[in-house]
Amino acid sequence: MLQPKRTKFRKMHKGRNRGLAAGADVSFGTFGLKAVGRGRLTARQIEAARRAMTRAIKRQGKIWIRVFPDKPITEKPLEVRMGKGKGNVEYWVALIQPGKVLYEMDGVPEELAREAFKLAAAKLPIKTTFVTKTVM
């Protein structure tokens, strides 16, 4: 699963997830899966969606993952009282704003790409839409 090789600090503040996304255009492939809603994707969810797409296109074409989980989420163990410091890092997430292109695909017909993205979207907790590259 995806996670940073090394970070400057082990733990991070919760922070806020406001604004609109950078990276709102399909830039590598021909088709893309764009976030409509706001939320966060865990490394497991990103990987599950990638696997679903890869199986759907039967390993033809190419897939780009445009998001990376770079925020550590901590949790305290079960039945531990409050206080006594921040919990341990349990998983990594990517913060997603509306408009962010999550995945891109190339080298497959549009119908197959739509089907693959539909399967991938079912694995994700945020609302998404299918987009194509616009040629200027």
From Swiss-Prot:
Disulphide-bonded residues: none
Gene Ontology terms: biological process: translation
A single cellular component GO annotation: cytosolic large ribosomal subunit
CDD domains referenced in this protein's UniProt entry, alphabetically: Ribosomal_L16_L10e
Keywords carried by this UniProt record: Ribonucleoprotein, Ribosomal protein, RNA-binding, rRNA-binding, tRNA-binding
Pfam families linked to this entry: Ribosomal_L16
Region forming the signal peptide: none
GO molecular function: rRNA binding; structural constituent of ribosome; tRNA binding
Quaternary structure (record): Part of the 50S ribosomal subunit.
Function: Binds 23S rRNA and is also seen to make contacts with the A and possibly P site tRNAs.
HAMAP family: Ribosomal_uL16
Family: Belongs to the universal ribosomal protein uL16 family.
PANTHER family in the cross-refs: 50S/60S RIBOSOMAL PROTEIN L16, LARGE RIBOSOMAL SUBUNIT PROTEIN UL16M
Protein name: Large ribosomal subunit protein uL16
